[in-house]
């Protein structure tokens, strides 16, 4: 519309210069502003008829509703009903002469911290390793272009946990991971000191053996033939024996002289 107004403003001087009133009247008559306003009201009603406290929350249908209307406004109503037999979404409109193209998506959010309690005669058994789920088939009813024809049905499975919740399973997995990490830490705290002690002991043994060999080689008085006495002691013994023999020979010679 703005482009048309700008072009008209540019064309007006040229039209005035030509002094053609008939052309001006035709141009003014050709400018017709058409405004189409479409108002859509979608009241959403939810009715849950179940004796079950489930962790599912029915949210309003989210999607894009595109209406191709050229004449008048349209009033449409969307109802969301959930019963035991299934889930149905129906769209109704006031006008029956217009075509409707609607895309409705239903999202169901599951709460992880909620626990479903079923009113049944069966005994409840909670296990932390397995989760039992029940599936409730649902259907979405979408009308075609003509309201007299039946719409297409598409099934939507809804899973509801019965006995255990997802938070309990996550808690058990976290406990297992914590226990495994604690055991690994205990093993590492035991193994590392043992390995360090073995390394220190082997190094100390090698050092002591080396020091002993160095001291044994540096000592000159150690005999190599297995005798306990050193060479200096042997020489002193030889000198003593020579002296005693010489004294004895001198005494014998003196005694012989006296006898003569």
Swiss-Prot record:
Protein modification: Highly O-glycosylated. Sialic acid-rich glycoprotein.
Subcellular compartments: Membrane
Glycosylated residues in this chain: 19, 28, 97, 103, 163, 177
Annotated segments matching region Disordered: 119-182
Residue stretches of biased makeup (Polar residues): 119-133, 145-170
Transmembrane feature ranges: 190-210
Topological domains annotated Cytoplasmic: 211-260
Modified residues (Phosphoserine): 236
Topology relative to the membrane: Single-pass membrane protein
Signal peptide (from-to): 1-18
Keywords associated with the record: Glycoprotein, Membrane, Phosphoprotein, Signal, Transmembrane, Transmembrane helix
Extracellular side: 19-189
Chief location bin: membrane
This protein's GO CC annotations: membrane
Role description: Endothelial sialomucin, also called endomucin or mucin-like sialoglycoprotein, which interferes with the assembly of focal adhesion complexes and inhibits interaction between cells and the extracellular matrix.
Name of this chain's protein: Endomucin
Species for this entry: Pongo abelii
């Amino acid at each position: 519309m703005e482009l048309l107004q700008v072009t008209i403003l540019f064309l007006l001087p040229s039209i005035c210069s030509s002094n053609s009133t008939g052309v001006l009247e035709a141009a003014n008559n050709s400018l017709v502003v058409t405004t189409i306003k479409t108002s859509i009201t979608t009241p959403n009603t939810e009715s849950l008829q179940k004796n079950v406290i489930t962790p599912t929350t029915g949210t309003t249908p989210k999607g894009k509703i595109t209406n191709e209307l050229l004449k008048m406004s349209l009033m449409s109503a969307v109802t969301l009903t959930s019963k035991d037999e299934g889930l149905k979404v129906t769209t109704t409109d006031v006008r029956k002469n217009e075509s409707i193209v609607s895309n409705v998506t239903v999202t169901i959010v599951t709460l992880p911290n909620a626990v479903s309690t079923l009113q049944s005669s069966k005994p409840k058994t909670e296990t932390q390793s397995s989760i039992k789920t029940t599936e409730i088939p649902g259907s979405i009813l979408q009308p075609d272009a003509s309201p007299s024809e039946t719409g297409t049905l598409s099934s939507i499975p809804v899973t509801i946990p019965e006995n255990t919740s997802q938070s309990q399973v996550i808690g058990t997995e976290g406990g297992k991971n914590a226990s495994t990490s604690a055991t690994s830490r205990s093993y590492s705290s035991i193994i590392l000191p043992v390995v360090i002690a073995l390394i220190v002991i082997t190094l100390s043994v090698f050092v002591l053996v080396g020091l002993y060999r160095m001291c044994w080689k540096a000592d000159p008085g150690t005999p190599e033939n297995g005798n306990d006495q050193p060479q200096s002691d042997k020489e002193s013994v030889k000198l003593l024996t020579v002296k005693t023999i010489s004294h004895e020979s001198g005494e014998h010679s003196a005694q012989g002289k006296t006898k003569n």
